[in-house]
A protein has these predicted regions:
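Phosphate-binding site recognition
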Residues: 1-188
Length: 188
C-alpha cells in the first residue's frame, strides 16, 4: 500500500499493490472537531502549531469559510508587507483599520474570523492577540511552524487570550478510517 498526495491539504490517495485506489478523497480529521469545539466554547484566539504540511492552515481555512460570513486570511510569508503594516499600529482600532485596508474588504463584527498564517515570521502578532481578543469584535486563528524555536523574543505572550493546539500528522485511527475500515472493526 502506498500513500501519496498533496501534503497539508487533508487529501489522501492510497493505492494497493495492483494500483487500485483504496481511498481517494477527503479525510475526516479529529482536528476539525477540536477547532469547532474551541470556537463554540471559548472566546480566546486559537493557535495551531506543529510541523510543516500537517494540515494546520487547511483546517482553519475550511472551518472559517464554512462557519463565518467573512473569513480573512493573512499569510506573513506570502504577504511580507503585512509584517511592517502591523508592527506600526498604535491601538486596536488602528490595527483593525490597517487590517481592513490591507485585505480590501469590509469587516463584519461578530461574523468575521481572522486567520494569521505563518506567525513565526511575525511574532508581533502574538503581542496584539490579547488586545484583539479583549475588544471582542472578531474571532482569531493563528498557525505557524517551528514556533518554539522562532518565538523566543516575544515581548508579551497573551496568556489567557490564546489557546494552543499542537497538530500532528494523521494518527492511526484517522489513517484506518481513511482506508475504509469501519466503526465496528475499530471499536472491536
Amino acid at each position: 500500500m502506498f500513500l501519496h498526495g498533496k501534503s497539508g491539504q487533508n487529501s489522501v490517495f492510497l493505492h494497493g499493490k495492483n494500483g487500485r485506489n483504496i481511498c481517494n478523497g477527503m479525510i475526516n480529521r479529529k482536528l476539525d472537531n477540536i477547532i469547532a469545539n474551541h470556537y463554540a466554547q471559548q472566546s480566546t484566539a486559537l493557535l495551531l502549531s506543529g510541523a510543516r504540511q500537517v494540515g494546520k492552515s487547511y483546517a482553519i481555512r475550511k472551518y472559517g469559510q464554512q462557519n463565518y460570513t467573512c473569513f480573512v486570511e493573512v499569510n506573513f510569508i506570502q504577504q511580507p508587507e503585512a509584517i511592517q503594516l502591523f508592527r506600526n499600529a498604535k491601538s486596536v482600532a488602528d490595527f483593525l483599520l490597517r487590517l481592513s485596508t490591507f485585505v480590501q474588504q469590509p469587516l463584519v463584527k461578530g461574523e468575521t474570523l481572522f486567520f494569521f498564517d505563518e506567525v513565526q515570521v511575525c511574532p508581533d502578532i502574538l503581542t496584539w492577540v490579547k488586545f484583539l481578543v479583549e475588544s471582542g469584535e472578531y474571532r482569531y486563528a493563528l498557525s505557524g511552524s517551528l514556533l518554539g524555536l522562532q518565538l523566543k523574543d516575544i515581548r508579551s505572550i497573551p496568556v489567557g487570550y490564546l489557546s494552543e493546539v499542537e497538530v500532528f500528522p494523521l494518527d492511526f485511527e484517522e489513517f484506518v478510517r481513511a482506508v475504509g475500515v469501519g466503526d465496528a472493526t475499530i471499536d472491536a
